[in-house]
Amino acid sequence: MTGIMDSVEMPKLPENQKTFAGIPEAVFLEEIDTFMSQPENENCEKVLQRLDEQHGKYRFMACNLEARRRKLKSQIPDLERSLEMVNVLRKEDEERETQFLLSDQVFIKTLVPPTKTVYLWLGASVMLEYPLDEAEALLNQNITSAVGNLKSVEHDQDFLRDQITTTEVNMARVYNWGVKKRQAATKTTATTPS
């Protein structure tokens, strides 16, 4: 699989986008005092709640991307094995004895005659018969597409990790800002005579 992974280029990103999935970018809060002085950010708890909600959305996206990555990682070897089988069938010019799974732990021996066609599962309970050349072309196309999709997903995962980290840092900075403000308010009330 590494040979195929190296030979397939990552698809081009859409113009003015940093991700394939359209993941929104988290803005790093450079000037926390300026940010917190804006009218919509007057309450530290509400800002933390908004950031926590954004963090939760990023985590949800990360779970979805990981599930997609796992599916693609398992799909690529299956496609490669199917392609290998098409190549084996192409080379065969006489009957070949093989075993296939009849049920759990039960195999049966059979003779496979030379063939010029193969049946491929296309998904959604659809199976079609293809000549060996067309089957090979389709499988190569599917492998290339799956590898490209895998690279896109891995790129988005890297980007998403950065957004999660940025959001976590922002949450920590806002929380610390709130602690300092409460400490300053406590000091002010403690030093002012009643």
Swiss-Prot record:
GO MF term set: beta-tubulin binding; tubulin binding
SUPFAM superfamilies to which the protein is assigned, alphabetical: Prefoldin (SSF46579)
Major subcellular location class: cytoplasm
Disulfide bonds: none
Null mutant phenotype: Pupal lethal. Most mutants die just before emergence from the pupal case. In mutant larval CNS, neuroblasts show bipolar spindles that may lack one or both centrosomes or monopolar spindles having one or two centrosomes at the single pole. The mitotic index is elevated twofold over that in wild-type larval brains and the ratio of metaphase:anaphase two- to threefold over wild-type. Mutant neuroblasts also show a decrease of 25% in betaTub56D/tubulin beta chain-1 expression.
GO cellular component: cytoplasm; prefoldin complex
Family: Belongs to the prefoldin subunit alpha family.
Record protein name field: Prefoldin subunit 3
